[in-house]
From Swiss-Prot:
<keyword id="KW-0436">Ligase</keyword>
<dbReference type="GO" id="GO:0005737">
    <property type="term" value="C:cytoplasm"/>
</dbReference>
<comment type="similarity">
    <text>Belongs to the class-I aminoacyl-tRNA synthetase family.</text>
</comment>
<dbReference type="InterPro" id="IPR008909">
    <property type="entry name" value="DALR_anticod-bd"/>
</dbReference>
<keyword id="KW-0067">ATP-binding</keyword>
<dbReference type="GO" id="GO:0005524">
    <property type="term" value="F:ATP binding"/>
</dbReference>
<dbReference type="InterPro" id="IPR014729">
    <property type="entry name" value="Rossmann-like_a/b/a_fold"/>
</dbReference>
<keyword id="KW-0547">Nucleotide-binding</keyword>
<protein>
    <recommendedName>
        <fullName>Arginine--tRNA ligase</fullName>
        <ecNumber>6.1.1.19</ecNumber>
    </recommendedName>
</protein>
<dbReference type="InterPro" id="IPR001278">
    <property type="entry name" value="Arg-tRNA-ligase"/>
</dbReference>
<dbReference type="GO" id="GO:0006420">
    <property type="term" value="P:arginyl-tRNA aminoacylation"/>
</dbReference>
<dbReference type="InterPro" id="IPR036695">
    <property type="entry name" value="Arg-tRNA-synth_N_sf"/>
</dbReference>
<dbReference type="Pfam" id="PF03485">
    <property type="entry name" value="Arg_tRNA_synt_N"/>
</dbReference>
<keyword id="KW-0648">Protein biosynthesis</keyword>
<dbReference type="InterPro" id="IPR005148">
    <property type="entry name" value="Arg-tRNA-synth_N"/>
</dbReference>
<feature type="short sequence motif" description="'HIGH' region">
    <location>
        <begin position="131"/>
        <end position="141"/>
    </location>
</feature>
<comment type="subunit">
    <text>Monomer.</text>
</comment>
């Protein structure tokens, strides 16, 4: 039950009634009509912009349209009052029974409350993480992983059919660099190279990856093959070490993701796409539509991009699809550019039936967005839509001081180190407390504090307190069925008559609307903000009982009022658990 959606339908029905009476013209576009909470609670329960949206196309003043709608709305579908405000907004007040009915729905549905059919089961592909298989994941990867996973869960909650995908970049120069680093570690393991020589190679940048994570892989190769690889040419050992390195690093990445509670449905290999002829297939398709040509690009102004060369190149007509320049598809050696593989990959997604695609990328990929969107438009003939979400950096701190380098990775703090230190639930929640494109400070000291300044503690504490009320209720009223279903059926919710209680009910009723708006905007951080509001309101209700015993949730001498308040408490717990479920965070029942 989405009470905001229901009232919007009521508003639109009254617009239609005014059209039928000839007071408003037919054919008005109502798509931008919205019903939402007012900016100030004193103004009412809801506000609508209907008059503001419809006035101009109707050829009327906004207040004139508002007055007509106010006249129609009062007394309909639980609307007890409506008034025009400002230039033409309409503030609405609902019969409290409407809100209490929503509370019963929360109790009946539990964590399923808030689920929506907005997505209509449409298939959407969320590609996230997609880190090069060259080592363990760092904290920046972790933020992208949490964001992508939570966004996928949010879309599922709102009615989309979601596939979580990881694109394995296993065909580029980086995996060759990995193979060379692994080979050097192997030489150390078999005694063909000493540690000092390895360190010198690393310092001279002859090898790129120096972290300890390659040591056990090299040891396994040494144990299995002995010194056999020390006497063969690079052309012989490079493919073998590349394959072993990719396999082991991908396994390491999957372990890191599992520790964070992230599981992808699909892993797609760039190398496999190329070998299967997907790039050739994509080229044939683009050429058949005259979207590929041979030409020489003008030298770009300012910083020269990596893919610009002063020679004739095979180019994709990206400018026809919103990009700034046409893009090269082949390198000077005749091999495909990374972008060509990317086009083929998105062509493959489209052929798999995805008209909705979301790519979660690091903030350093900002310059890549336009060309990716152009590619998706081209390969899908405009049928598919791509949204690219850029995830900003994470700064690791401890009591405000930057955290030092990790020995395991050699150059950065690994995601696994952070998860092992504070737990996956803390990492996941904190990563979602800021919008994805805003930088985030992750302070070990702060995220483990038991204060209201720590958002994950504050929300979990609210859930734990709600659970403690339920446990206490079982002792206070022994033999009573206090299940959510029983409370929905028997509790007299009219006894929730305090302003603070009804404000809490209205806040909970807004959960389905929040789910839909956050899903539509692809912004799961809105859930974190909402959970913070719910927690603050609930802690406020709890604290008033400290000041006045009559305001406590449970009154041994007033069972009816206690059950009504317990119903509210159970609903709070359900909504918090529902939000945490989207985040992949286990709700705490008891603080330890």
């Amino acid at each position: 039950m989405n009470v905001f959606h229901d009232i919007k339908e009521t508003v639109l029905a009254q617009v239609a009634a005014l059209q039928a009476e000839g007071r408003l013209p037919e054919g008005l576009e109502t798509g931008r009509v919205a019903v939402e909470p007012p900016r100030e609670a004193a103004h009412g329960d809801m506000a609508t912009n209907a008059a503001m949206v419809l006035a101009k196309p109707a050829g009327l003043a906004p207040r004139a349209v508002a007055e007509m709608l106010v006249e129609k709305l009062v007394g309909v579908d639980g609307i007890v009052a409506a008034e025009t405000a400002g230039p033409g907004f309409i503030n609405l007040r609902l019969d409290p029974k409407i809100w209490r009915k929503t509370l019963k729905t929360v109790l009946t549905l539990g964590t399923a409350f808030g689920a929506s059919t907005m997505g209509r089961g449409a298939a959407v592909n969320v590609e996230f993480v997609s880190a090069n298989p060259t080592g363990p994941m760092h904290v920046g990867h972790g933020r992208g992983a949490v964001f992508g996973d939570a966004l996928a869960a949010l879309l599922v909650k709102a009615g989309w059919a979601v596939t979580r995908e990881y694109y394995v970049n296993d065909a580029g120069a980086q995996v060759d660099s990995l193979a060379r680093a692994l080979y050097a570690r192997y030489r150390v393991a078999v005694g063909d190279l000493d540690e000092a020589a390895f360190a010198a190679m690393l310092a001279a940048r002859e090898i790129e990856y120096g972290g300890d994570y390659l040591v056990p892989v090299a040891a396994d190769i040494a144990q299995a093959d002995g010194t056999r690889w020390t006497t063969v040419a690079e052309s012989d050992w490079l493919p073998a070490f590349r394959a072993i390195g990719i396999e082991r690093m991908l396994a390491l990445i999957k372990e890191d993701l599992a520790a964070l509670g992230v599981v992808h449905d699909v892993f797609t290999s760039e190398q496999a796409l190329v070998r299967a002829g997907r790039v050739d297939e994509m080229m044939t398709d683009l050429e058949s539509r005259d979207l590929v040509y041979v030409g020489t690009l003008e030298p770009p102004k300012g910083k020269t991009p990596d893919d610009w060369e002063p020679r004739p190149q095979t180019l994709f007509r990206a400018t026809g699809f919103g990009d700034e320049v046409d893009r090269p598809l082949k390198k000077s050696d005749g091999s495909w550019t990374y972008f060509a593989s990317d086009i083929a990959y998105h062509h493959d997604k489209f052929k798999r039936g995805f008209l909705g695609m979301i790519n979660v990328l690091g903030a350093d990929h900002g310059g890549y967005v336009k060309r990716l969107k152009a590619a998706v438009k081209a390969v899908s003939n405009g049928e598919a839509e791509l949204d690219v979400k850029l995830v900003q950096l994470v700064k690791l701190l401890d009591n405000g001081e930057p955290v030092k380098m990790s020995k395991r990775a050699g150059t950065f703090i690994t995601l696994r180190e952070v998860v092992d230190e504070v737990g996956k639930d803390v990492v996941r929640f904190i990563m979602l407390t800021r919008k994805n494109d805003a930088a985030l400070d992750f302070d070990y000291a702060r995220v483990t504090e038991k204060t209201r300044d720590n958002p994950v503690f504050y929300v979990q504490y609210a859930h734990a307190r709600a659970c403690s009320v339920a446990r206490h209720a079982a002792q206070t009223f022994p033999g009573r069925d206090l299940s959510a279903a029983a409370l929905a059926a028997t509790a007299d919710l009219d006894l929730l008559d305090a302003d603070e209680e009804m404000a809490m009910v209205r806040l909970l009723a807004g959960w389905p609307r929040l789910v839909e708006s956050a899903a539509e905007a692809h912004e799961p951080h809105r859930v974190a903000f909402y959970l913070g509001e719910v927690a603050a309101a609930f802690h406020g209700l709890w604290n008033r009982g400290n000041d006045n015993a009559e305001l406590r949730f449970l009154l041994p001498t007033d069972e009816a009022r206690s059950l009504a308040r317990l119903a509210l408490v159970q609903a709070v717990a359900s909504v918090i658990a529902s939000g945490l479920e989207i985040f992949g965070v286990e709700p705490v029942k008891e603080m330890r």
